[in-house]
Regions:
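Alpha-helical, hydrophobic structural elements that either
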Residues: 3-24, 28-39, 66-444
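Intrinsically disordered, low-complexity cytosolic tails and juxtamembrane linkers
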Residues: 36-48
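Internal signal-anchor transmembrane helix that establishes type II topology
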Residues: 45-75
Length: 444
């Protein structure tokens, strides 16, 4: 056995050890909230409102998608050696075939810049980026309560302005060293935005008694993926349970495939997301997605096959999550808990004030697992004033009834709300089973 092979085998053993560690670790409720926190930050900073659809299992999936054996290539081994101690993050991206192929093509930009003070540090280890996506790998050391991720993240361009992007971050990855946490920030570029010439990653403590901040600035090497973009026209129409979906085009980048679709405004249902969506090639390999952006005009993001373009590609799904458009708007009496309009079976079970916010509890039939949670776009009071509803949390069971889920929606600055309010549903856990498939012309 050569020294090189021994090195690969040793690395593989380390990665599989981390895989076992992930499979046995519990997933805290904070995992989902951490992802939602990143989405909310992005939504507030966008010039135009961006809605990011993500299934309720996505946060856990960011941590727990480890199936089968972990095999490593020389480029993959080199990547780990470039970023010591990053086996946890590497195990996570190992399930993203597109990112792994990008690494195999030496598209990783090493950064290695650290901001350290008062015994704590933040290091940006490296990035992978193209015109559509940027993945930022970082390491936290000595942070207070990193498992709670009590920090806000800002991404700034070379002029110090917020990037108009959406991004997510997962629950901090466990490490053999409890003082070290490894993670990544997954950034989407939309609406003509692109990677900046220079990027600043800023972490700010949410602790009101502290003004701690860590800032790392570095140039972005856009030449690594310059010109790497392939557009595949599709221009076909799907009809799923009577709902018309126009599939416009697929755009291939090194880090992802972007499928652009239009949902017919004349559809009777609001489609929140397509269920079990995947692209399948002639070898039966599945290229999956759990993220999309937009409303009627929507971009759906898949793993990239840029460096392994198939001969045949089929879009497959089992149906969709959606709701009749006439059930999206409702009126709610905060005193009597009476709901007028909305989907059948939705009930208000209580409310409470927390600081400046109002928390409204709803009972929803069924489970949030594997689907969309109840969420709202906004709340309007009797005077026409609008309030944001940035997030929801949930727990199983309505008293002794395990067939329902309690969803708690936070109305920002709504502590003084009284009487009747109007609410608009953004997502709801209503699934429609209607399998579909569509051939994508890879070489039109």
């Amino acid at each position: 056995m050569t020294d090189e092979q021994k090195s690969f085998d040793t690395l593989e053993e380390r990665l599989n050890a981390r895989k076992t560690e992930y499979e046995t670790m519990p997933v805290p409720d904070a995992a989902y909230q951490a992802v939602q926190s990143g989405i909310r930050q992005a939504a507030r900073k966008r010039k135009s409102r961006l809605r990011w659809y993500m299934s309720s299992i996505s946060a856990a999936a960011l941590i727990l998608l480890f199936t089968g054996c972990i095999r490593v290539s020389p480029a993959f081994a080199s990547f780990v050696e470039q970023l010591p101690g990053m086996e946890g993050i590497v195990s996570m991206i190992r399930q993203d075939k597109g990112l792994m192929m990008a690494i195999d093509q030496s598209l990783l930009q090493k950064v290695g810049v650290t901001d350290e003070h008062d015994g704590t540090s933040l290091t940006v280890d490296g990035i992978i980026t193209d015109e559509s996506r940027m993945v930022i790998f970082y390491t936290m050391k000595g942070m207070k309560d990193p498992e709670k991720f009590n920090y806000d993240i800002d991404l700034l361009d070379e002029n110090g302005k917020d990037l108009p992007v959406a991004f997510t971050h997962a629950y901090p990855t466990p490490s053999p060293d409890e003082n070290v946490n490894e993670n990544m920030i997954d950034v989407i570029f939309t609406d003509g935005t692109s990677p900046p010439e220079e990027l600043s990653v800023v972490f700010k403590s949410r602790d009101t008694t502290s003004a701690e901040k860590w800032k790392i600035t570095f140039p972005v090497d856009k030449n690594l993926t310059k010109g790497m973009k392939k557009v595949i026209p599709v221009n076909q129409t799907l009809t799923v349970d009577g709902q018309r979906i126009d599939v416009k085009q697929a755009t291939l980048y090194p880090t992802r495939l972007v499928l652009d679709v239009n949902f017919d405004p004349k559809n009777t249902k609001k489609v929140f997301g397509l269920s079990d969506l995947q692209l399948v090639d002639e070898q039966g390999r599945a290229w999956r997605t759990d993220t999309s952006t937009g409303e009627d005009e929507r971009s759906i993001y898949f793993e990239s096959m840029y460096f392994s373009i198939p001969k045949k590609l089929t879009l497959q799904g089992s149906g969709f999550s959606g709701l009749d458009k006439e059930d999206l708007a409702l009126s709610l009496d905060l005193k009597s808990h009476q709901i007028t309009g909305g989907p059948p079976g939705l009930k208000m079970v209580g409310s409470k004030v927390e600081g400046k916010d109002l928390i409204i509890d709803f009972s929803v039939a069924g489970s949030m697992d594997g689907g969309f949670v109840l969420s709202f776009g906004n709340v309007t009071d009797s005077a026409g004033k609008s309030y944001e509803v940035p997030g929801s949390s949930w727990s199983s069971g309505d008293g002794t009834d395990d067939s329902h889920t309690i969803v708690s929606s936070t109305v920002e600055n709504g502590a003084k709300l009284k009487g009747e309010v109007k609410m608009n549903i953004s997502t709801y856990p209503m699934k429609v089973k209607s399998p579909f498939s569509l051939d994508i012309p890879v070489n039109p």
